[in-house]
């Protein structure tokens, strides 16, 4: 199995990576990796740094999923060629944020969703 994780693994393993990268002023990105018994710990088959600054968590994920087909095809190509990525990034793991974490997120001008995001989402799901 292949998993998509919205951070540059092995940093920010676990839940809500955008949230934690915002608090730490860290680089955003996406990683495709093979699934194993440990959380977000399998061999990395594709990584992409995302340099765009986003106004909300939803904008980040909309961007990631918009480009998902391109990223996924590159991951499959690397897997077929048995091309694995060795990352020199420090390992970290995060779980569910508490009130203090959320307060820090807001201090960093973090937003989960903006009112304008509702229109983008509506356009995507409109039938």
Task: Give residue spans per PLM region.
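C-terminal accessory region of SF2 helicases/translocases
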Residues: 118, 124-127
